[in-house]
Amino acid sequence: MNNEAYLVPNPATPCQPIRIDPEICISCYRCADQCRTDVMVRNSPKAGGIARCEESCPAGEAVRWTTYHIDRGQFEDALENIRAENPFPGVCGRVCFHPCEEKCARIPLDQGVGTNALERAAFDYGTPESGKQPGKRPSTEKKVAVVGAGPAGLTAAYYLAILGHKVTVFEAQPVAGGIPRINIPEYRLPASVVDSEVELVASLGVDIKVNSPIDAEAFARLTQDYDACFVATGAPLSQKLGVLGEDTPGVIGAIEFLRKSRLDNNAEVGKKVVVIGGGNVATDSARLAHRLGAEEVTMVSLESRDTMPSYESEIALAEEEGISISCSWGVNKINAKAGKLASLDLKSCISAFDRQGNFSPSYDESKTSSIAADTVIVAIGQATDLSFADEKMKAGSRIEVNSNTLETPVPGVFAGGDVGTTIRSIVQAIASGKRAAISMDIFLTGGDKNVLLAAGIGPTSIGSYMAGGDAIPGNHVPEEPESAFFGPGKRQEPAMLSGEKRTNSMNEVNEGLSREAAISEARRCFRCDQYSPPLVLYPDECWFCGTCVEECPAPGAIRMEHPLNQRVAWKRKKTGELFRRGMKNPPPPNLRPPVGEIHGHTTP
């Protein structure tokens, strides 16, 4: 029997009792899972298909396979699946802005799948030390220098090592990890999580040299001593307000404040703290100041409450912890009294953005206010440090790069992460590091640049590249399934540390999902278009109960030869007993074909 003949209409096939139209089928496999006789079975994974969540994940994770494994309690397999495209699931599972969830096909039904919490669950329960690594290629004997041990630099180092290159990472700080390790507070991202993932990178043979700042002279030597160089120095400085009084003692940049707390454990604040800014760094600083003993903490944001750039969840947690938020105000001047910080003069901000959506604050200078403060933390953005770079590489406040290859104007030098773009997030830095690794491998081995330039859909895939395909292999995004067919399912939310325990310690606030909750959440995933259409493996075994048609969320995908009113919902067991098989309303006896004579098939 030619099983493929039953996938689509085929005039040459004399008997086609049940068929699946691959143009309509969304490969959700509800039919195969509900089939009582195994007429339909699961098929192989579909090549090139990419779900909406995966298309919007900068790191290129195969989200559907993560939910598939967690659904079955296979947390180690889920962790291995994530690390095939992203070496930092422990970090991303805690602090990623998860754009994947905003594109989830389940949203029209109830709520999107909590893929961010599932990524963390894969790390928490997948025993990180046993997470398998992708196979390493034989050594190329090529040497690569990476400047900066943040998410972009370490990601590039991780995949360059897998691709067979000898990698040395130079980090100015006393620890590796970049922003996640140095600037995100312990209560959001424990140091032990970052350290364990840095150790995984080092386990591939990557030499990470901390306390190794690179100046212009040292950088010039690197370009001579190594076959290629990747610059990933990030944006390690706080931006200045540019107002009178900013140099008053007691005014500190947020990046420096967070670093002092994380590395030196000696950050100090007064009783009345004002944090300038409305982003995640501002909420981190405000919540940290409260934990360090400040009695009053106020955030002053140019943006309105609904346009603040900080994650809504972080704003809500800050307010729960007693942080006050003053929106639509800008700083006019910082005042001192007897040489000490005393207050801030504020002016009303009418709008933080122009009509094109660009950051361009406009003020009503006639509307003013004042706020007392003995500590001011400036969290209005981050700045790069390009003091080491060749002048040919500089483009304003960042390094000039080719957006496809991440090459700089200096041959053999590549750049990525925050230093090469104005779009700054950890997961986008990871994506940049992975793309750089592929581009550098092509440069070092004389490969074809077209694999990076191919017009695929979605993010870069190291797995596809190593398999000999294009770096962006996606070729289609499936239509959204009819979500109502799947039925509602309550989203599982992570447990949170109680308010009193939060503010009196640096313990992690988000406690994550339990194993059971993670499995339950994974089962909410539709796994859109994950596989090729089901195989109708044994068509002559079909009872025509109609369950597959009833369960199918894609009308017209399943076609039956029997008329609807003659589908059989009953079948005789070997004992002679009749039993119901799936239909909500089985047809009356006068409309049922005789048991044992269904399409020429004799039942026991």
Q: Over which residues does each language-model region extend?
A:
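Feature captures the FAD/FMN-dependent oxidoreductase FAD-binding
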Residues: 77, 138-139, 143-147, 195-243, ...
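Mid-to-C-terminal Rossmann-like scaffold of FAD/NAD(P)H-dependent oxidoreductases
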Residues: 11-13, 316, 320-322, 330-340, ...
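Iron-sulfur cluster-binding cysteine motifs and their immediate structural context
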Residues: 2-9, 19, 26, 30-47, ...
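A conserved FAD-binding loop/helix module that cradles the flavin
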Residues: 285, 419-447
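Glycine-rich dinucleotide-binding loop and its adjacent helix/turn
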Residues: 121-138, 196-216, 238-292, 394-411, ...
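Rossmann-like dinucleotide-binding cores of NAD(P)H-dependent redox enzymes
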Residues: 166-210, 261, 286-333, 450-466, ...
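FAD-site-proximal beta/loop scaffold in flavoenzymes
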Residues: 247-271, 354-423, 427-430
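N-terminal Rossmann-like FAD-binding beta1-loop-alpha1 element of flavoenzymes
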Residues: 143-168, 282-290
